Amino acid sequence: MIMTIKDSIQIYLEWKQTHTSSAYATYKIRLQQFEAFVKPKATLNEIDGDDIIAFHRSLENQYSLNTIAYSARVLKNFFWFWHGRGKTTFNPKEIIPIRYVSADKDIVTAEDLDDMSDLLEVNNLQDLQKKLIIHLLWDTGMRLSELLDIKIDDINEQGIDGLRTAKVRTRKSMRYNLVIWGSDTNDLMNRYLGIRLCMDCESKKLLVNPKTEKVFTPRSVQRWITELSEMANLDKKITPHSFRHGKANYILDQGGSVRDVSALLRHVKPESSFQYMQLSKKRYEDVARRYLTTFSTNALQTA
């Protein structure tokens, strides 16, 4: 049976969706883009290494090097899948994705959190929701998708120490994990739950827009955070994911290990945590400063 490129992509994506939901969408975009580029070639066996090279060269004027490298990983995984099934003679080893290190990104600090939180009033529902969201992102290091997926039933009873936990599902790995937050954040949670449980709303999600009765969109949360960071004069480009990166750096700054980062951020692969070992600009300056030799003026004059 001759395998067409269109069918091979569909079959691969269906297999991919059985164990991950977040990667499915981005894989689909890149693979369909590749399919459109290689036309009029229609079958999988017609593809060779020259097609891969030409495709990625065509992306250079429109996309970043990181995006092109990601596309290379997508195609490599795709061809490994079909190489394993014996449907292509093309050797995926010819695809060598280059790993580019992203520029130093802005992260949220504990002081940034306080500055943004101080702008919000707990007696206003919209402010309370925003305040709860940024505190949960900081305390737990959750991904935004994980936070917005939380249902009311996922939240566990409060412990005697004032801490509380919730069960979250990671779209990336399709695994359930436990997240925990502190007593200050739990005070916000209790206040919000008192209102949320009284809402006449069919949705079981924790964080819903009272006007639409639907869960908040990632774009809405991003807009809030941008507005809050500007109002707090942070002079940073803050995203919801900046809280996760900030939490990792905070753990390391407090003397925690990469193992602690891996556990608290719930990384499936331990090597994912090693990216945080790369020193931020501030931590690099602090470390370098400790090991610089300082000479007195007199010593320099007599030398």
Regions found by a protein language model. Name each.
Residues M1-A303:
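Conserved catalytic core of the tyrosine transesterase superfamily
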